[in-house]
């Protein structure tokens, strides 16, 4: 599977063996009001555990986790 990964530049990369999920994790930091949420993209073997202040979405098809504010190619 291929997933988009951060940091910038955001690129689509092949995940390591056993990592068959893509994820998009978002949360607010001290600059959330001016910059918006922090966004982390990557690969995972299982959907990461969510802390109370985070949102996470997992998916299992190639490049299914595009940056929410960036247009898909």
From Swiss-Prot:
<feature type="disulfide bond">
    <location>
        <begin position="47"/>
        <end position="58"/>
    </location>
</feature>
<keyword id="KW-0872">Ion channel impairing toxin</keyword>
<feature type="disulfide bond">
    <location>
        <begin position="28"/>
        <end position="32"/>
    </location>
</feature>
<dbReference type="InterPro" id="IPR003571">
    <property type="entry name" value="Snake_3FTx"/>
</dbReference>
<keyword id="KW-0008">Acetylcholine receptor inhibiting toxin</keyword>
<comment type="similarity">
    <text>Belongs to the three-finger toxin family. Long-chain subfamily. Type II alpha-neurotoxin sub-subfamily.</text>
</comment>
<dbReference type="InterPro" id="IPR045860">
    <property type="entry name" value="Snake_toxin-like_sf"/>
</dbReference>
<dbReference type="GO" id="GO:0099106">
    <property type="term" value="F:ion channel regulator activity"/>
</dbReference>
<comment type="function">
    <text>Binds with high affinity to muscular (tested on Torpedo marmorata AChR, Kd=0.38 nM) and neuronal (tested on chimeric alpha-7/CHRNA7, Kd=12 nM) nicotinic acetylcholine receptor (nAChR) and inhibits acetylcholine from binding to the receptor, thereby impairing neuromuscular and neuronal transmission. The toxin also shows a very weak inhibition of GABA(A) receptors composed of alpha-1-beta-3-gamma-2 (GABRA1-GABRB3-GABRG2) subunits.</text>
</comment>
<keyword id="KW-0800">Toxin</keyword>
<feature type="disulfide bond">
    <location>
        <begin position="15"/>
        <end position="43"/>
    </location>
</feature>
<feature type="disulfide bond">
    <location>
        <begin position="59"/>
        <end position="64"/>
    </location>
</feature>
<keyword id="KW-0964">Secreted</keyword>
<protein>
    <recommendedName>
        <fullName>Alpha-elapitoxin-Nno2a</fullName>
    </recommendedName>
</protein>
<keyword id="KW-1015">Disulfide bond</keyword>
<keyword id="KW-0629">Postsynaptic neurotoxin</keyword>
<dbReference type="GO" id="GO:0030550">
    <property type="term" value="F:acetylcholine receptor inhibitor activity"/>
</dbReference>
<dbReference type="GO" id="GO:0090729">
    <property type="term" value="F:toxin activity"/>
</dbReference>
<dbReference type="InterPro" id="IPR054131">
    <property type="entry name" value="Toxin_cobra-type"/>
</dbReference>
<keyword id="KW-0528">Neurotoxin</keyword>
<dbReference type="GO" id="GO:0005576">
    <property type="term" value="C:extracellular region"/>
</dbReference>
<dbReference type="InterPro" id="IPR018354">
    <property type="entry name" value="Snake_toxin_con_site"/>
</dbReference>
<dbReference type="Pfam" id="PF21947">
    <property type="entry name" value="Toxin_cobra-type"/>
</dbReference>
<feature type="disulfide bond">
    <location>
        <begin position="3"/>
        <end position="22"/>
    </location>
</feature>
